[in-house]
Amino acid sequence: MELIRLTTRLTLFAGFLGLTATLACTLLLVETLFRCQIDRAPFARICFNGVSRCLGFRMSTQGAFSERPVLYVSNHISWSDIPVLGGQVPLRFLSKAEVGRWPVIGWLATQAGTLFIQRGSGKAGQARHEITSTLSSGQSVLVFPEGTTTAGVTVLPFHSRLLHAAADAGVDIQPLSIGYLRNGHPDHLAPFIGEDEFQHHLIRMLRKPAVEVGVIAHPVVTIDNTTDLADVTRDLRQTVHDGLRQIQAGRLSDQASGGPTAVAGPEL
């Protein structure tokens, strides 16, 4: 059964990846020929949702995403956080530079408008400037303030240096919580940690039955240049942590619509 599931999902994933690459090339060609700039956000959101379906995710969401540009902050468990969260609302990501060098995936991430940062390179100031510029242009940006992925059972302390971009751009911050469950417990396959390689992790994910993914969009937090970011950062981390606990306890419901919202992949 695992072999059938893997073969089916891998075929779907590869086929959808090919369609996504074709779409990205088409948009790039149109921009080049007509010397125009196409908003890729709606296309990226469709593609991210497609990836989540191919991975077999069953998603439930709670809360309302901001209708205005905001700086999203979230806990970070896996590379799959990106298609999950990117499928919820149009946004751009801040990602480590290594992702940009991944075959096909890296190129697609670049075409989707991902902002890449060199870890440990002392270029946080440049990243802050790029985030501020993107927010000021009317686009939301998602950052992972933990600075690394975790096993998904807790939330590490948040780094505050990139959160200054929200104050610089005059936008709010909206915390998000994401969690993966399998059989009612934190999933041990979803975390992308240590020296794991993308292709090996992907195969393991595709081989196993569908995983439940919970996302909580918490109320926005307003800051300005007079705000004590150290306190705000601690509060944001606690909010995200409490949300993760709620997801792990299976107490997720869509308060806005009165029921859970599910996006299911193939039942394999």
Language-model features: where?
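A cross-family acyltransferase "interaction/gating" segment
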Residues: 104-106, 153-227, 234-235, 250-257
